[in-house]
C-alpha cells in the first residue's frame, strides 16, 4: 500500500484535489480524513463523488494528539482493505513534518510512504503566513510537490512571485501553478 499525504490549510482545495485524483486513477484507493467535529464534511463530499473507501477521524489531530489511534488505523486499513493507495488528508493546521515522522515509525513491509503534496491557496497565502507562520513554513518545507490552487485569474507575474516565495523555503520542491485538472494522469 502506497501512502500519499495531501496537506494544506482549510479551504485550500485538498478535497477537490483528492476527488480529481480518485476520478483519474484505475487503482483502488482508500482516503483517510482527519477533521475536527462530529462528522467530516469532506468525507461526505468524497463519498458522493467517488467509489473509494473513506476512513474518518474527527477527534484530535493525527500529527500530534492521536498518534497511536492513527498508526492503528493505518495498519487496520493495510490489513483489511489493502488498497493500492491510501490518501491521507490531514486537518488544515497539521504539521506535515510531524505526520511524516509518525508514518515513518510504522514498521510494516507492505507500506510505502510517497512524496507528500501540499495544496496552497494562492489567494490566501499572505493570511497563512501571518496567522500560522510555523505551520505555513512546515507545509511548504516538507512537501515534495506544491500545488497552487485558485490561480485561474492570476497574471504570470503573480505566479512567478509565488514560485519565488515558496522556493526560498523549499528550493527542491516541484511547483505547479496550473489547475490540477489540466495535469497529465
Give residue spans per PLM region.
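C-terminal accessory "lid"/substrate-recognition subdomains
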Residues: 142, 154-185
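Residue-level signal for inorganic ion chemistry
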Residues: 35, 89, 143, 149, ...
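Short histidine/acidic/glycine/proline-rich micro-motifs that form metal-
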Residues: 125, 152-154
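Charged helix-capping and loop-helix junction motifs
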Residues: 131-135
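A short, aliphatic-rich alpha-helical micro-motif
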Residues: 80, 137-140
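A short alpha->loop->secondary-structure connector
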Residues: 104-111, 136-137, 163-170
Amino acid at each position: 500500500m502506497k501512502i500519499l499525504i495531501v496537506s494544506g490549510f482549510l479551504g485550500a482545495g485538498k478535497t477537490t484535489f483528492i476527488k480529481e485524483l480518485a476520478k483519474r486513477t484505475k487503482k483502488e484507493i482508500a482516503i483517510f480524513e482527519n477533521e475536527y467535529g462530529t462528522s467530516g464534511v469532506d468525507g461526505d463530499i468524497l463519498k458522493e463523488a467517488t467509489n473509494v473507501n473513506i476512513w474518518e477521524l474527527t477527534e484530535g489531530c493525527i500529527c500530534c494528539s492521536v498518534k497511536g489511534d492513527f498508526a492503528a488505523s493505518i495498519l487496520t486499513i493495510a490489513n483489511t482493505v489493502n488498497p493500492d493507495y491510501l490518501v491521507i488528508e490531514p486537518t488544515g493546521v497539521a504539521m506535515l513534518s510531524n505526520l511524516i515522522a509518525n508514518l515513518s515509525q510504522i514498521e510494516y513491509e507492505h507500506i510505502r510512504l510517497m512524496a507528500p503534496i501540499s495544496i496552497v491557496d494562492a489567494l490566501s497565502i499572505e493570511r497563512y503566513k501571518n496567522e500560522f507562520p510555523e505551520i505555513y513554513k512546515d507545509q511548504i518545507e516538507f512537501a515534495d510537490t506544491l500545488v497552487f490552487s485558485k490561480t485561474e485569474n492570476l497574471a504570470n507575474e503573480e505566479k512567478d512571485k509565488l514560485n519565488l516565495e515558496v522556493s526560498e523555503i523549499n528550493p527542491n520542491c516541484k511547483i505547479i501553478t496550473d489547475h490540477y485538472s489540466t495535469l497529465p494522469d
